[in-house]
Amino acid sequence: MRQRTGPYSVGATATTRAGAEVVFKHLVVAEAWSEWGTFPSRARRERPGDDAPNGVGAIRAIPPAREQVVEYDPPRRYAYVALSGLPLKEYRAEVTLEPRGFETVIRWEGAFEPKYRGTGALLRLFLDRMLTSFARRVAYHCERCEPGCPARLPDIL
């Protein structure tokens, strides 16, 4: 992880047969998160990015959390920070996509500082499982993405 935030870090890796471009679209399009994730409510983009609709500055809401894109380098790197809705003072996640032959390695890393003293170990366990689930689910979905998925819309980057 290039830029570390907080004393705790977590990470997960998954491999998919989908290309890095396909995976990147599923990461940056907020509405696509509802296609591959298991969230209590629909994900949506609240605000477009400064130079690209889903780029740096874009704000995504996956209630109760709100996140802002801080790094956008298609199709290799994507990073975001939590703005609200999580029991964390600071949270930054970075996703790196590495093409390897006919596959793409998804490396999802996060760093955080707990909001409440004594909760760091429990939050690390939770976030480690969450990122592992995210990496596996997006990898699986990208190999089987159906028409109608928001990540398949033209000109989304």
Where on the chain are the PLM-derived regions?
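Acidic pyrophosphate-coordinating catalytic loop
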Residues: G49-P53, L88
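A conserved amphipathic terminal alpha-helix motif
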Residues: A111-L157
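A structural signal for short, well-ordered beta-strand segments
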Residues: V10-T16, V95, W108-G110
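Juxtamembrane/interface motifs at transmembrane-helix termini
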Residues: R42-E46, G55, F126-D128
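Short coil-to-beta transition motif at edge beta-strands of beta-rich domains
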Residues: P53-R60
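Hydrophobic-ligand binding "helix-grip"
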Residues: S34-E35, A61-V105, A111-E113, T132, ...
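Hydrophobic ligand-binding cavity/cleft-lining segments
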Residues: M1-D50, D155-L157
